[in-house]
Amino acid sequence: MSKPIILTGDRPTGKLHLGHYVGSLKNRVLLQNENKYEMFVFLADQQALTDHAKESEIIKDSIANVALDYLSVGLDPEKVTIFIQSQIPELAELTMYYMNLVSLARLERNPTVKTEIAQKGFGESIPTGFLVYPISQAADITAFKANYVPVGNDQKPMIEQTREIVRSFNHTYKTNCLVEPEGIYPKNEAAGRLPGLDGNAKMSKSLGNGIFLSDDADTVRKKVMSMYTDPNHIRVEDPGQIEGNMVFHYLDIFGRKEDQTDIAAMKEHYQSGGLGDVKTKHYLLDILERELTPIRRRRLEYEKNMDQVLDILKKGSETARETASETLSGVKRAMGINYF
């Protein structure tokens, strides 16, 4: 019996950070190690071009960095197919066929797209590729017959749009060749969207308020020591607030079961006074380094042999293309356009 299929990926627009790690990467490794699924993980460079068309060098430079991030967190190319979206031309052809089943009005109603258009300040100059990228996502998902797609809650409209396209295609062409996917959403929404070190609602590459998976130990230390805490906690003996204090927020997310007694005691001590921010930050640093040290070690090993990293991407893309080609053939048969 074949395993259920999972598809997931990232836009290669820069290095990945702790927000990506707790939001998706760590869970991908757990799913991989369960050995219950066939997994495809991809670098969505074509999607990144929808709002970086004039900055393609950023995407090119990011491919290797994101691949290193994948491998360093523990994704295993022997267990997971890692590929580059643009190396699978079948995805673009599938997108074209699906576009004929989706109205412009439906795309414009997609709440995720509407929010992102406003955030990016496109105004009336919306790139066509950006507006239709939910259809491209549907092609990505259906090409690999994904049963499950791990995404954040903000991506629920994208999953629903893919499900609509699958139902429309299968009904129109009287087939069942496309698989209707299900989203896998974060159980802990707080962990799924890690705030920035400065207390900003989201850790972001553009805001420069994150800890990158590629940061060395000294850089991580400096960033942790500059974290936002309680601005009114001026003296050690002063009572402090843990609400909105990023150090305690991070401890809640990164602390393991065996850390909970110490963290609870620290919270009580901090709130009653007598515990300084330097001590809490050093404790958090130890917790973070417990996660980051093995990641950093694996990254250094892969950095010594970038030819191996590129070979992993090349072989993964070849494997992925075989699967996508089979799906495309089935789609064309259903449509009656397999002429020869």
From Swiss-Prot:
Question: Motif 'KMSKS' region, which positions?
Answer: 202-206
Q: Motif ('HIGH' region) spans which residues?
A: 12-20
Q: Which UniProt keywords apply?
A: Aminoacyl-tRNA synthetase, ATP-binding, Cytoplasm, Ligase, Nucleotide-binding, Protein biosynthesis
Q: Which InterPro entries match?
A: aa-tRNA-synth_I_CS (IPR001412), aa-tRNA-synth_Ic (IPR002305), Rossmann-like_a/b/a_fold (IPR014729), Trp-tRNA-ligase (IPR002306), Trp-tRNA-ligase_bac-type (IPR024109), Trp-tRNA_synthetase (IPR050203)
Q: Which Pfam families match?
A: tRNA-synt_1b
- The keyword Ribonucleoprotein appears for this protein: no
Query: PANTHER family per the record?
Result: TRYPTOPHAN--TRNA LIGASE, MITOCHONDRIAL
Per its record, how is this protein called by name? Tryptophan--tRNA ligase
Q: Which organism is it from?
A: Streptococcus mutans serotype c (strain ATCC 700610 / UA159)
